[in-house]
């Protein structure tokens, strides 16, 4: 049977499949046509994400059904050196005791007018 896969760019891919094919198998066919690795693919049908081990018939996908292909979000572990840099940039700040403005680490007075450029600053509290 024939099914359609619509990508986020609006492109529609036509695939020849059987109802007994697994979602893994469909993702492999998409990789053959589009070059997108299966581990980055997420298939959606009727508002549900399709699980790899299940078959098309499990989701009641019939001929000429349309699946939606979205890419898995990238993310994960931040490199330790970048984490230290981000921590230094975000955590080593001064806070105005009156208006709670975030100020550079070496600031002596607040930069805001609403607190009268006070010199009552404290270091930003550390995360636990």
Curated annotation (Swiss-Prot):
<feature type="cross-link" description="Glycyl lysine isopeptide (Lys-Gly) (interchain with G-Cter in ubiquitin)">
    <location>
        <position position="6"/>
    </location>
</feature>
<comment type="similarity">
    <text>In the N-terminal section; belongs to the ubiquitin family.</text>
</comment>
<dbReference type="GO" id="GO:0016567">
    <property type="term" value="P:protein ubiquitination"/>
</dbReference>
<feature type="cross-link" description="Glycyl lysine isopeptide (Lys-Gly) (interchain with G-Cter in ubiquitin)">
    <location>
        <position position="29"/>
    </location>
</feature>
<keyword id="KW-0963">Cytoplasm</keyword>
<protein>
    <recommendedName>
        <fullName>Ubiquitin-ribosomal protein eL40B fusion protein</fullName>
    </recommendedName>
</protein>
<dbReference type="InterPro" id="IPR019954">
    <property type="entry name" value="Ubiquitin_CS"/>
</dbReference>
<dbReference type="InterPro" id="IPR019956">
    <property type="entry name" value="Ubiquitin_dom"/>
</dbReference>
<comment type="similarity">
    <text>In the C-terminal section; belongs to the eukaryotic ribosomal protein eL40 family.</text>
</comment>
<dbReference type="GO" id="GO:0042254">
    <property type="term" value="P:ribosome biogenesis"/>
</dbReference>
<keyword id="KW-0689">Ribosomal protein</keyword>
<dbReference type="GO" id="GO:0005737">
    <property type="term" value="C:cytoplasm"/>
</dbReference>
<dbReference type="GO" id="GO:0031625">
    <property type="term" value="F:ubiquitin protein ligase binding"/>
</dbReference>
<dbReference type="GO" id="GO:0005730">
    <property type="term" value="C:nucleolus"/>
</dbReference>
<feature type="cross-link" description="Glycyl lysine isopeptide (Lys-Gly) (interchain with G-Cter in ubiquitin)">
    <location>
        <position position="48"/>
    </location>
</feature>
<dbReference type="InterPro" id="IPR000626">
    <property type="entry name" value="Ubiquitin-like_dom"/>
</dbReference>
<dbReference type="Pfam" id="PF01020">
    <property type="entry name" value="Ribosomal_L40e"/>
</dbReference>
<feature type="cross-link" description="Glycyl lysine isopeptide (Gly-Lys) (interchain with K-? in acceptor proteins)">
    <location>
        <position position="76"/>
    </location>
</feature>
<dbReference type="GO" id="GO:0031386">
    <property type="term" value="F:protein tag activity"/>
</dbReference>
<keyword id="KW-0687">Ribonucleoprotein</keyword>
<dbReference type="InterPro" id="IPR038587">
    <property type="entry name" value="Ribosomal_eL40_sf"/>
</dbReference>
<dbReference type="GO" id="GO:0019941">
    <property type="term" value="P:modification-dependent protein catabolic process"/>
</dbReference>
<dbReference type="GO" id="GO:0005634">
    <property type="term" value="C:nucleus"/>
</dbReference>
<feature type="cross-link" description="Glycyl lysine isopeptide (Lys-Gly) (interchain with G-Cter in ubiquitin)">
    <location>
        <position position="27"/>
    </location>
</feature>
<feature type="cross-link" description="Glycyl lysine isopeptide (Lys-Gly) (interchain with G-Cter in ubiquitin)">
    <location>
        <position position="63"/>
    </location>
</feature>
<dbReference type="InterPro" id="IPR029071">
    <property type="entry name" value="Ubiquitin-like_domsf"/>
</dbReference>
<feature type="cross-link" description="Glycyl lysine isopeptide (Lys-Gly) (interchain with G-Cter in ubiquitin)">
    <location>
        <position position="11"/>
    </location>
</feature>
<dbReference type="GO" id="GO:0002181">
    <property type="term" value="P:cytoplasmic translation"/>
</dbReference>
<dbReference type="InterPro" id="IPR001975">
    <property type="entry name" value="Ribosomal_eL40_dom"/>
</dbReference>
<feature type="domain" description="Ubiquitin-like">
    <location>
        <begin position="1"/>
        <end position="76"/>
    </location>
</feature>
<dbReference type="Pfam" id="PF00240">
    <property type="entry name" value="ubiquitin"/>
</dbReference>
<keyword id="KW-0539">Nucleus</keyword>
<keyword id="KW-1017">Isopeptide bond</keyword>
<dbReference type="InterPro" id="IPR050158">
    <property type="entry name" value="Ubiquitin_ubiquitin-like"/>
</dbReference>
<keyword id="KW-0832">Ubl conjugation</keyword>
<dbReference type="GO" id="GO:0022625">
    <property type="term" value="C:cytosolic large ribosomal subunit"/>
</dbReference>
<dbReference type="GO" id="GO:0005829">
    <property type="term" value="C:cytosol"/>
</dbReference>
<feature type="cross-link" description="Glycyl lysine isopeptide (Lys-Gly) (interchain with G-Cter in ubiquitin)">
    <location>
        <position position="33"/>
    </location>
</feature>
<dbReference type="GO" id="GO:0003735">
    <property type="term" value="F:structural constituent of ribosome"/>
</dbReference>
């Amino acid at each position: 049977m024939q099914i359609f896969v619509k990508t986020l760019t609006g492109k529609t891919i036509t695939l020849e499949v059987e109802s007994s094919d697994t979602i893994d198998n469909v993702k492999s066919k998409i990789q053959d046509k589009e070059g997108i690795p299966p581990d980055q693919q997420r298939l959606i049908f009727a508002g549900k994400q399709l699980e790899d081990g299940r078959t098309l018939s499990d989701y009641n996908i019939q001929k000429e059904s349309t699946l939606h292909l979205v890419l898995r979000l990238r993310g994960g572990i931040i490199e330790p050196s970048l984490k230290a840099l981000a921590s230094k940039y975000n955590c080593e700040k001064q806070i105005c005791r009156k208006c709670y403005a975030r100020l550079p680490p070496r600031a002596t007075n607040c930069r805001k007018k609403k607190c009268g450029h006070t010199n009552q600053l404290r270091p930003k509290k550390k995360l636990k």
